[in-house]
């Protein structure tokens, strides 16, 4: 592809292939005084130094449609959540994610493109340099486009993304374990001194039967955040003693809570992972939370949920089958999140440099 043909008919991908070396290079407007000039002057970056590797052009009509579709999809969760919050009627499953993970509803509502998408935008005629909801903190705008700019990352933010990426890679490379059968929710109410969700749901079994099950079944919870809510009397019964420091070594891809956490890590990786991946992770987390609570000792009949009775062999088989199904859905989301983080971290140096 020649530079002349590129200028005449812009490609959806801002890349050119060098025939002599076969390498991918990026064509990019030269920077002048913090802004991109007209496309008559270009620099070609080497493979090692290229900004994005491949940057996809998103025409205004395309990304506007994506944003509208995303907002409609997110509204299925955020509108009812706001209504329940205003009425003081929390849902033990659907509202848990907004309480356990303290991210605003607006984070789901607002569409952000994510790394590698170069969105058309006429800042000269628009009322603002960037579209509504697109933060100047992490995005760069030109006269004609805007994009998520990893050059705006601070060292602290880069280190946080690096840690998240390392954790996700460690989990992805580990064999799944499906032998826990959701005992963590039972261990949390062992002894009856503290029942976490008693404000929204009552227990479906007598305390003595709950305690007997916890004390008679093997508990092998590998998730730090779940384990830390165990009743003090149940913690010694767990085969593992996970800590914040050991989570990279212990968390595994079969774990309901580790897979639910994909929403948390995606939220922490915003705007780099993009809103569509964030919402994909959230929707999976809703299903995981549903499994979590249906297998718990709580009575959710008021909320239209049928219990998975893990106190029985049939219930444990049912739980394991559902756990495996959801873990298979979590795996590609984890890989997408890892890919977005790797791409961001690979190009975290500022794009607006001297050449």
What residue spans do the PLM features occupy?
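Active-site acidic/histidine clusters and adjacent loop/turn architecture
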Residues: 47-167, 303-354
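Charged low-complexity "KEKE/polyampholyte" interaction tracts
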Residues: 242, 250-355
């Amino acid at each position: 592809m020649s530079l002349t043909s590129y200028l005449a008919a812009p490609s959806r991908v801002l890349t050119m292939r060098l025939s002599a070396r076969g390498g991918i290079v990026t064509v990019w407007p030269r920077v002048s005084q913090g802004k991109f000039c007209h496309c008559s002057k270009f620099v070609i970056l080497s493979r090692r130094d290229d900004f994005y590797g491949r940057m996809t052009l998103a025409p205004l009509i395309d990304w506007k449609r994506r944003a509208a579709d995303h907002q409609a999809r997110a509204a299925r969760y955020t509108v009812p959540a706001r209504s329940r919050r205003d009425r003081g009627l929390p849902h033990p499953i659907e509202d848990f994610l907004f309480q356990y993970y303290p991210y605003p509803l607006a984070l789901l509502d607002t569409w952000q493109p994510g790394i590698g998408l170069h969105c058309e935008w006429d800042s000269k005629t628009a009322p603002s340099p960037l579209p509504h909801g697109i933060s100047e903190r992490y995005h760069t705008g030109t006269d004609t486009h805007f994009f998520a700019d990893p050059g705006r990352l601070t060292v602290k933010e880069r280190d946080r993304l690096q840690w998240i990426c390392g954790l996700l890679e460690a989990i992805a490379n580990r064999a799944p374990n499906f032998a826990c059968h959701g005992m963590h929710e039972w261990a949390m109410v062992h002894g009856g001194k503290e029942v976490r969700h008693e404000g929204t749901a009552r227990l479906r079994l007598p305390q003595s039967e709950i305690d007997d099950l916890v004390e008679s079944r093997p508990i092998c919870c590998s998730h730090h955040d779940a384990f830390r809510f165990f009743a003090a009397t149940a913690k010694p019964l767990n085969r593992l003693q996970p800590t914040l420091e050991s989570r990279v070594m212990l968390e595994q891809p079969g774990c309901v809570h580790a897979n639910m956490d994909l929403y948390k890590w995606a939220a922490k990786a915003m705007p780099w992972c993009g809103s569509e991946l964030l919402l994909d992770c959230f929707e999976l987390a809703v299903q995981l939370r549903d499994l979590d609570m249906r297998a718990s000792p709580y009575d959710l009949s008021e909320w239209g949920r049928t219990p998975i009775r893990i106190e029985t062999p049939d219930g444990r088989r049912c739980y394991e089958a559902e756990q495996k199904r959801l873990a298979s859905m979590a795996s590609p989301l984890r890989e997408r999140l890892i890919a977005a983080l790797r791409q961001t971290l690979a190009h975290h140096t500022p794009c607006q440099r001297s050449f």
